[in-house]
Structures are given as structure tokens and as C-alpha cells.
Amino acid sequence: MRQGKMYRVKNLAKNVRNDCMGVINHGPYQRAPHARLETLDSSWKAPVKDTLRDGDVVACVGVDKFVTDHYESQPFYKVLTLKGHVAYVSKGNRNKYFELVRD
């Protein structure tokens, strides 16, 4: 992901359970206090109200590095959703669930 570019969510419909994405502010793999954009099961009733589905667009607003449970800094891409939430996307989720809207 590059700063200032728009990205479309893709491939979520192929998942059996985790068929949407939402901003998560908690979790077991969190070493730094930052919100993450993670896949979610849409049937799970959670405090996450706004979810992203295939075709939704986010904007990349930067890249930061955070120490993960692997004890090394990993790049996390800071994105802005259409609802105004700012969250971080891991490199693995970036490759699997996002595509550049256009160059």
C-alpha cells in the first residue's frame, strides 16, 4: 500500500466464516495501542457496528512499524475507512484482501 492511494476490499466473500472486516480495538496479539482492521464473522454480534465488505474502499494514509509477538518490527498500513475510522492493516491482510482502485 502507498500513502494517498485508494484500495478496494476483495476476496471476503470467498471465506466461509469471516466474510466482513471491522475495526478492532482489543485482542491477544496487540502490543501497541492501535486499532486494527481484521476479518470478522458477520453473524457474530459484537460491538463492531461498521463493517466493510467486498467492494468497499479505504484510503492508505501512512505506514508505521510495530513490534509484534514475533519480537520484531512489522509494517502496518494505516487506513481511513469511509466512516472516518482510522485503523492498521497487517501485511498479510493487505496482500489477501485489498487491491489498488487505479493508478
Residue spans for each PLM region:
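A structural detector for beta-sheet-dominated domains
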Residues: K10-L12, V61, L80, V101
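Conserved beta-strand/loop element in small beta-rich adapter and peptidoglycan-binding domains
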Residues: G27-Y29, H34-T68
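Generic detector of low-complexity/intrinsically disordered segments
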Residues: K14, V23, T39-S42, D54, ...
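Short coil-to-beta transition motif at edge beta-strands of beta-rich domains
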Residues: R2-G22, A32-D41, P47
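Structured surface patches comprising rigid loops and adjacent beta-strands/short helices at the edges
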Residues: G92-V101
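SH3/SH3-like beta-barrel superfamily modules
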Residues: R53-G92
